[in-house]
Amino acid sequence: MAEALPEAGRYFCHSCTAEITPRLPEYTCPRCDSGFIEELPETSRNSESNSSNNSGTDQNRPSFENIESAQFTLPSGYGQVTFGIFNEGLDFPMFGTSGPVEETRDGESRREHQSRQRYGARQPRARMSTRRGAGRNEGVPTLEGIIQQLVNGIIAPTAMSNLGVGPWGVLHSNPMDYAWGANGLDTIITQLLNQFENTGPPPADTDKIQALPTIQITEEHVGFGLECPVCKEDYTVGESVRQLPCNHLFHNDCIIPWLEQHDTCPVCRKSLSGQNTATNPPGLTDMTFSSSSTSSSSSTSPTDENNTANNS
């Protein structure tokens, strides 16, 4: 004779946090297919019969019945925050003062509250349920995103120094390693710039600096509107300037400090070694200067003087 099927009875599903009629003979939840169910005592069935009749069938219950919440206690002075995640949507964080969270929320049924109180069940971990309404959850912010906004919005860097990674699973390192606000970003940029401060070309050789020719500015130089590329001051007739191998002219006090730190021309970035010297730089390509037979200091053009210095 075949054995009679066991009676289904009433069970409590810890995954759905709701009273259900299990699927036999597997004893699984018909809503979430979970086997984490517990049989209700006979006394609890009678006490909750009225609430079961009023609430209707499981299929007609609103989605707010299956709310799951998680409570985080923030550092002193910040109170508490509760996250509520529904099966078909997301309840954004609500901030309040320190103290117990309201036990009866709009989205939690009376029976669910009594069941949790009876079994001493802990508040389940906040998670995104995908068994129903998966399409509606597309584009909904994740819990990690909400926590990141919470950290960026209300937790000060001084308060985060003692938290470490702790419950803030989205922070994968020390919170003080992050840039907090505009000032923190400015600090990082300043540090990066300081790292590149001394990474330029090496200083020019002292002998090459002393060997740079000194010429005097003539009226032809002034007529072309030449100026010192460093201080941007116009040259005056009879003024002594230093000429680099690339034919660029500079005030002595402007170019010497630069060459003592960098072996390059401030204008064309050519070295003083002569290997990459620009014989006709763009600024002097179309300039021609006539020789003066009466003045020994301005008897040749800047180009001729540079060639003479190289030949010697």
Curated annotation (Swiss-Prot):
Residues 302-312 have a biased composition (Polar residues). Residues 41-63, 96-139, 275-312 are annotated as: Disordered. A zinc finger (C4-type) spans 13-32. Its EC number is 2.3.2.27. Pathway: Protein modification; protein ubiquitination. Residues 102-115 have a biased composition (Basic and acidic residues). Residues 124-134 have a biased composition (Basic residues). Its main location: cytoplasm. E3 ubiquitin-protein ligase that mediates ubiquitination oF target proteins. Depending on the associated E2 ligase, mediates 'Lys-27'-, 'Lys-29'-, 'Lys-48'- and/or 'Lys-63'-linked polyubiquitination of substrates. Part of a BAG6-dependent quality control process ensuring that proteins of the secretory pathway that are mislocalized to the cytosol are degraded by the proteasome. Probably acts by providing the ubiquitin ligase activity associated with the BAG6 complex and be responsible for ubiquitination of the hydrophobic mislocalized proteins and their targeting to the proteasome. This is E3 ubiquitin-protein ligase RNF126-B.
